[in-house]
Regions:
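Short glycine/proline- and aromatic-enriched beta-strand/turn motifs that initiate or cap beta-hairpins
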Residues: 19-55, 63, 118-120, 197-199
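Transmembrane beta-barrel strands of outer-membrane/channel proteins
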Residues: 29-35, 66-70, 109-115, 147, ...
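Extended low-complexity acidic/polar segments
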Residues: 52-60, 121-166
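Cleavable N-terminal export/targeting peptides
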Residues: 1-24, 197-202
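Predominantly the C-terminal beta-signal and adjacent terminal strand-loop region
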Residues: 65, 72-82, 150-202
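Flexible, surface-exposed loop regions and adjacent strand-edge segments
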Residues: 46-47, 81-84, 124-130, 174-181
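Outer-membrane beta-barrel domain signature
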Residues: 39-43, 76-78, 98, 130-135, ...
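Gram-negative (and chloroplast) outer-membrane scaffold detector with strong preference
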Residues: 56-127, 136-140, 188-200
């Protein structure tokens, strides 16, 4: 937590120092598609993931993004549908260190807080029974790293990896995993995305 707090403070201080520069405030939206998997207690398949995001760049190297993802997870004994959203601080690493330099390829990172609603269906392998669970969860820190390539001044494409830890232990819906004070369910994903900018980059 101290390292995360120090990182956020560093970004804000750097923003204040460069605030006198001619800043470009931009909105952008993305559409994403890729693969994801549940890192939980049981075996999990690699499944598809769909997502979208809206980002506001309040500094040339930093922004606030709101994202939404649909994760249709599954495994040999369960199916789980997760609707997840998060608000994130995004950082353009290239511009953080070289503010006045333009790049065709950029490296971005983000950290955020998320919430999710999910429905799980578990089928027992030992008895002919089925368990369904609907619940909510929170995620912190939601982490992502992406590489983005500018096609034009308005469009870019990218590849993103993300990690979402949850404050629950039973996204599979298996009653055996209903343990107190155990939080080890995570979603990992990799997506390709298309970004549209409403105003030209610097």
């Amino acid at each position: 937590m101290k390292k995360i707090s120090a990182f956020i403070v560093f970004v804000l201080i750097a923003g204040a120092v460069s605030a006198q520069r001619d800043l470009a405030y931009k909105w952008s939206v993305t559409a994403e598609y890729g693969l994801s998997s549940l890192d939980g207690d049981g075996d999990s398949y690699i499944k598809q993931v769909y997502g979208t995001s809206v980002e506001y760049a309040f500094l040339p190297f930093a922004g606030i993004a709101l994202d939404y993802y649909y994760f249709p997870l599954g495994g040999p004994a369960f199916t789980t549908n997760v609707n997840a959203a998060s608000v994130n601080l995004t950082v353009n690493v290239n511009r953080l260190f070289f503010l006045d330099t333009d790049y065709k390829v950029i490296l971005k990172g983000s950290i955020g807080y998320g919430i999710a609603g999910y429905t799980s269906k578990y089928i027992s392998s030992t008895t002919p029974s089925q368990t369904s669970v609907s619940n909510s969860a929170s995620s912190f820190p939601v982490l992502s790293v992406s590489v983005e390539y500018y096609l034009t001044k308005l469009f870019s494409v990218g590849a993103k990896s993300q990690f979402r830890p949850f404050n629950v232990n039973n996204l599979e819906g298996d009653p055996r995993y209903n343990l107190d004070n155990v939080y080890n369910d995570n979603i990992v994903g990799a997506t390709l995305y298309l970004r549209f900018k409403f105003s030209n980059p610097d």
